[in-house]
């Protein structure tokens, strides 16, 4: 559909959204159009009104979707109709007035130090043709707090080994510098010399991307998530675990060891300090330690 193609071009060129974000937006619009087709005779997105939106919202809530999923769908459709209004294709945005009740922010899940040690033990003891790559990925993600998507886009020219800093291209093409430590430095240099260069030579690749798949082509975000899930499985950690927890763990470790909120905001690449404030929680151990230390009736008789 020409309308969707124009919106895709707008998201990609003007908004400079990532391919993953653009795909998610288009999928949400497609799902809405399918809903309209399945539930009535209205198939033209230009004719949608508030009644259609209300019916769709009821449908989403009836499916017991997570509030974050519903919010994402509404955001995509609101952006789509703003684009249509901007280009005089519709008069009003039917999603403009949709408001979801604010949900209290959930504390981010993170790995405790003991759990991180289990992850590193698992990846260092593993076998495989690209073991060094996997080690470097874990060291870089935990050592810098960068997003998985940022890690996938990393190029060697972004890394300054002498200053031990990485130039990260974040959301909205915003650049930031993040430092990295000795473990990440050694892992990257070892990987480059003993895996990356031989792989590129073997498969006759000439790009500059740091992390590669088994054909020496730039790895995808999905590829990194798969590797991390394999490491998590090998570590025998239980519970609901997601690779993004490495980023949460990085922020938590900094704050628990005395870093100020502004510094953590800069390192994570958050545009707003309020986004970073969710990390001001402390670990249970820290909470108990402070309680025992400062509350007069905390000790046993």
UniProtKB/Swiss-Prot annotation:
Pfam families referenced in this protein's UniProt entry, alphabetically: Phage_int_SAM_1, Phage_integrase
Superkingdom in the source lineage: Bacteria
One term under GO cellular component: cytoplasm
Active site (record annotation): 147, 171, 244, 247, 270, 279 (o-(3'-phospho-dna)-tyrosine intermediate)
Keywords for this protein: Cell cycle, Cell division, Chromosome partition, Cytoplasm, DNA integration, DNA recombination, DNA-binding
Protein localization: Cytoplasm
Xref: CDD domains: INT_XerDC_C (cd00798)
Record bears the keyword ATP-binding: no
UniProt cross-references to Gene3D superfamilies, sorted A to Z: 1.10.150.130, Intergrase catalytic core (1.10.443.10)
Domain Tyr recombinase positions: 106-292
PROSITE patterns, per the entry: CB, TYR_RECOMBINASE
PANTHER family assigned: PHAGE INTEGRASE-RELATED, TYROSINE RECOMBINASE XERC
UniProt similarity note: Belongs to the 'phage' integrase family. XerC subfamily.
Stated role: Site-specific tyrosine recombinase, which acts by catalyzing the cutting and rejoining of the recombining DNA molecules. The XerC-XerD complex is essential to convert dimers of the bacterial chromosome into monomers to permit their segregation at cell division. It also contributes to the segregational stability of plasmids.
Name assigned to this protein: Tyrosine recombinase XerC
Organism: Pediococcus pentosaceus (strain ATCC 25745 / CCUG 21536 / LMG 10740 / 183-1w)
């Amino acid at each position: 559909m020409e309308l969707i193609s124009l919106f895709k071009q707008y998201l990609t060129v003007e908004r400079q959204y990532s391919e993953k974000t653009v795909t998610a937006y288009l999928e949400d619009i497609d799902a809405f159009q399918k809903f309209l087709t399945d539930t009535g005779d209205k198939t033209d997105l230009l004719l949608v009104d508030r009644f259609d939106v209300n019916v769709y919202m009821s449908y989403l809530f009836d499916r017991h979707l997570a509030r974050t999923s519903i919010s994402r769908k509404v955001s995509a459709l609101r952006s789509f109709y703003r684009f249509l209004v901007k280009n005089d294709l519709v008069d009003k945005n039917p999603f403009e007035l949709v408001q979801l009740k604010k949900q209290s922010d959930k504390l981010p899940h993170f790995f405790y130090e003991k759990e991180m040690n289990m992850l590193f033990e698992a990846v260092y003891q593993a076998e495989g043709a690209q073991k060094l790559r996997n080690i470097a990925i874990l060291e870089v993600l935990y050592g810098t707090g960068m997003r998985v998507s940022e890690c996938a886009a990393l190029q060697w020219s972004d890394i300054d080994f002498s200053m031990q800093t990485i130039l990260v291209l974040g959301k909205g093409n915003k650049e930031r510098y993040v430092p990295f430590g000795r473990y990440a430095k050694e892992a990257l240099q070892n990987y480059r010399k003993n895996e990356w260069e031989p792989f590129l030579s073997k498969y006759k690749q000439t790009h500059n991307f740091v992390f590669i798949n088994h054909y020496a082509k730039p790895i995808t975000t999905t590829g990194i998530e798969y590797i991390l899930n394999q490491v998590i499985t090998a570590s025998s950690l239980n519970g609901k675990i997601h690779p993004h927890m490495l980023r949460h763990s990085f922020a938590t470790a900094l704050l628990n060891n005395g870093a100020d909120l502004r510094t953590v905001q800069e390192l994570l690449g958050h545009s707003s300090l309020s986004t970073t404030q969710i990390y001001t929680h402390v670990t249970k151990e820290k909470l108990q330690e402070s309680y025992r230390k400062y509350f007069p009736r905390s000790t046993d008789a």
